[in-house]
Amino acid sequence: MGMKYYAKSKKKGLSDKERGKQIKEPEEEQKTLNIHQEDIVRCAEAFFEEYGRYFSEKEKRLVIEACRIHDWGKANLVFQVMINPELAGERKLNVKSISQIPHGHLSAVTLSQNEFFAMDDSFTKDDFGAFVTAVYHHHTRKDQEDSSELRTYGKKYYLEEISDYLGQTRTKLYCSNLNQLLFHNNRYSGKFLCDPAVWNEYLLVKGLLNKFDYTVSAGYENAELACDIREKRLEKEVESFLEGKDLRPAQQFMKEHMDDSLVVIAPTGSGKTEAALLWLDGEKGFYTLPLKVSSNAIYSRIKNGYGYEHAVILHSDSMAMYLKENPGSAWEKQEQAKLLANPVTVCTIDQLFTFVYRALGTEIFAATLKYSKLIIDEIQSYDPRSIATILYGLKTIQQMGGRYAIITATFPPVLKDFMEQYGLADHCLFADFTEDPDILIRHKVSIQYSEMYLEEIAKQGKTKKVLVICNTVSRAQEVYEKLRERNDSVWLLHSRFIRRDRNLLEQKIMEFSESDEAGIWVTTQIVEASLDIDFDILHTEMCTADSLLQRMGRCNRKGRRIPELSNIFVYDNKNGSGSIYEENLYQRSLEKLKKYEDILFSEKQKTKYMNEVYRTEAIRNTEYYRKIQDCMEKFSEIHPAEYTLSEAKVRDIKSITVIPDTIYEENQELFEEVEDRYLSKERKQEIRTKLQDLTMGINLRTCFGHPDGIDKAAIGSTDIHRTQFVYEFDCETLQGRGLLLGEKADSIFL
C-alpha cells in the first residue's frame, strides 16, 4: 500500500478549562481506514459470539461482509484530501471544485456479483440486492449521479486508490449493481414492490451495519453491554422480590411461555410488570409505555426497586434523569442508550417504531428488535395511528424472528380482530386473567348527569384521598380553583406545568398516595396509565371505556376494601365529547356503562363492558376503526426514503415548546451561555437539558387560539418560545394553576 488511507478527519476541540484561553486540545491520532474497518468487523464478530443464536449463518456472514466493504469508497482521492488537506498540494487537487460522490455509493459498485457469490455458497441474487442496498445507503445521501458519472469519477479519483488500498488491481466499477438496488433515495414513481423476506434482510444488514459502525465511531469496542443471557441478573432480582409469595396466574403464565409472543390481559394490581420482566428471561429487552412519566416510573422501579443497574431509559427527556442520577456519567449513559446497547431499555414507542415509515436511518431499530424481546404495556391507551404503527411494526418484528408481549388491563376486541386480519394472532398466545378469583372487587359506579358536585368533593377530601379527573386542562384549572375555596388540601396536575414543576408534582402525588394524608388531587388524562397511585374515591368526567377503566384503576387499586357505597362517580357533562373523544365511542361507552351502575363492578364485568363497547361490528364505521385500517394500508404502501428521519413520527403531535416569561427572566444566563460557540458538546447538551426542564409543550391548535400571548420567534438557536401568559406555581406548597392561557401578567417582558 503506497499511501495511508484514513477513515475520518482529525478531531480537534477545546476543553472547558481551556475555552477562555482558546488553547487547542492535543490532536487525537487519526484512525486509518484499515484499522476502522478491522474494528467494525471485530465488533460484529464479538457481537455474534454473544447473540449468534438469533441469526442464521448466512445472516451473520452478510453482516460481517457488509462491515468489511462498506467504507471502501472512502479510499477515493477527493475524500482523502478533504480529511487530510495537506494532501491537496502534494496531489495538486482542488477539491472545492469537485462534486464528491458519496463513499457508500462507490463501495456498492466496487464489488462484483461474482465476487459476492464467491464469499459464501449460500448467497443468492436476492441476498445481493439486500446487501448492496445496505452498503449503498449506509449513510443517508441523495442519488444524484448516474452510471456514467460514477465511471468518470472512478477513473479520475478512485480506481487507482482502491487498487492500492486493497492490494489488488481494480480496473472498473460495476455500475450494473445499481440495477439490483431495492430503492433509490430520489424521486420515485409507482408502487414499491419488494418481497418482505428480502426487505427484512435489508433491514437486518443495514441496521446491524449502522449499529456496529456507530459503536466503533463512538469509541466503544462492543455493541452490547452487560449481556444478561447467561447470568439472568434481572430475573434473579425479580424472583428475590417475589420470594415467599406464590406467583400470580399472569406471572406463572408468562414464566412458562418465555419463548412465545404473548397478549396478556390482567387487571391492575395483578403483577403484570413482574410477569413481563420474568418473561424476558435475561434476554435483551425493551419495555415500552405510552407516556414518559410512566416510563420514568418503570425505569426507577427496575433500577432502584430491583437494584438492576444496567437498565437505561430512552426518550426526549431522559438526559434530565441521567443528570440527576450522576452528572459525571450522564453524557455517556445517554449515548449508550441511543446506541441501544443495554440489556434493558425502558422507552416510549416513539423511539423504536420509526422503521415502519421506511426512513433511512431507522433500520437499526428493526434489526435490534430481531434479537430482543419487546414489552408493550397498555396498548389501548394509544391513539388509532399509534396502534396501527405498533401492529404493523409487530408484523415486521415477527417476520424477522423477534418476540413481543402485549400486557394490558383492557384489550379491545377490535385490536384482536386487526391482529387476526394481519396475521399476528396466528403467531402469539392470548391469555385473559380478568376472571382470577383472587382479584377483589374494587369498584361501585354512580353516574351523574351534571357538573361535578364540588361541595361533596370538598367534604370528602377532609377525611379521604379524592382523585378528580377532567378531560381538559382548562376544566381542571377551573375545578381546582373552586375546590381551593372550599378546602386547602387541594393540588393540581396537568400538562401545562414546566417539566421541573411537573416532576415535583408527580413525586408529590406518589408520596401522597402512599401516606395517611387526606386531600384532593385534580388531574387530567396524564394519570390514566402512568402513575402507580391509589385513592379512596374517584370523580371523573365521562370518557371512552378504555380511558374510564384506566381511571378506575387509580381508585382502590390494591383492593383493600370491597365498596359498600359508590367510590367511582362519573359525570356525563359532555366536556370533551366530539373534541377529545369521538362522540360515537363516548356515547356507546356511556350507554353500555348504565347496566353496571350501583352494583359491584367486577374485573370480569369490566372486560365484558369493554368488549361490548369495542365490538368490531358495532364500531366498524367509527373514525377510530377507519383510522387504524387506513394507517395499516398506508404503511404497506410507503416507499423507502419517502419519509426522512425527522419526518418519521410515530405520534402526530404538533406542538411548540414554551417558557413563561417569569421563568425566562430567572434563567436568562443559561440562554446566553448555550449560544457560546466554544462550549463543549457535553456542556451544551447539559444546558439544553436544563432549559428543557424549564419549558412545557403547547399543542399548536391551542396556540392558534391564543396568537398574542406566545412569541412567534424562538429564543436564539433554541426551539423555545417565550410566553407572556401568567404562570402560577408555589415551589414550597406545590400548589398553583400552572400556565393560564389568555391571562397575561400585568408587566410584560418584551
What kind of feature is each model-predicted range?
Residues 364-373, 379-434:
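Post-DEXD/H (motif II) to motif III coupling segment of the RecA-like Helicase ATP-binding lobe
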Residues 282-306, 315-318, 413-415:
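Conserved Walker A/P-loop ATP-binding site and its immediately adjacent core
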